[in-house]
UniProtKB/Swiss-Prot annotation:
Residues 23-82 bind DNA. GO terms for molecular function: DNA-binding transcription factor activity, RNA polymerase II-specific; RNA polymerase II cis-regulatory region sequence-specific DNA binding. PROSITE patterns: HOMEOBOX_1, HOMEOBOX_2. It comes from Caenorhabditis elegans. Gene3D superfamilies: Homeodomain-like (1.10.10.60). SUPFAM superfamilies: Homeodomain-like. GO terms for biological process: cell differentiation; regulation of transcription by RNA polymerase II. CDD domains: homeodomain (cd00086). One of its GO terms (cellular component) is nucleus. This is Homeobox protein ceh-7.
Amino acid sequence: MKHEMVFTFLLMMVRPEASTSRIPRRRTTFTVEQLYLLEMYFAQSQYVGCDERERLARILSLDEYQVKIWFQNRRIRMRREANK
């Protein structure tokens, strides 16, 4: 057991990326209801503040990070469509 810990420590010293290896996060699939509400909020305001993001996440049973990224991606999609 002790040898395994020493080996792991030495491996992390030599190859730092070995300590950060992790399973990639699965892509979020939004429900129709979640998308509807997110689009409604986006139509009102393209930017959502911290408090509103927290509230939206709670209502939709999502992480704040997921709501934040959804708004970022939606703004990018809107700009891309406007440039066509």
